[in-house]
Amino acid sequence: MNLSNQPLVSVVIPCYNHEKFVQDCIQSVIDQTYQNIELIIIDDGSKDGSVEKIQEMIPACQERFIRFEFRYRPNKGLSETLNEALEWCEGLYLSPIASDDQMLKQKIQI
């Protein structure tokens, strides 16, 4: 399918101390059947190994997504993290997902 026929969907993952789950979350976005996706990940000052787990996924994200952003910043809380991520989104649609959740493969396609 021609990506120009698909609206861009912005997927936002705010992360805080989810090193055990964040890679599965990111992989579930990579595995989406819908293709025209940008992924924005913001780590909100995690004190565990979340940042390292996210960094391990960067090459796969850069290959898969139309646009990919990963930012780390001091903890400011979920609301401010989501508001900041919204400023970076370029998609027509937004699909936030918690870093300890996973998407079904056709979630965005539907």
Residue ranges and their predicted role:
Residues 1-110:
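Nucleotide-sugar donor-binding/catalytic module of glycosyltransferases
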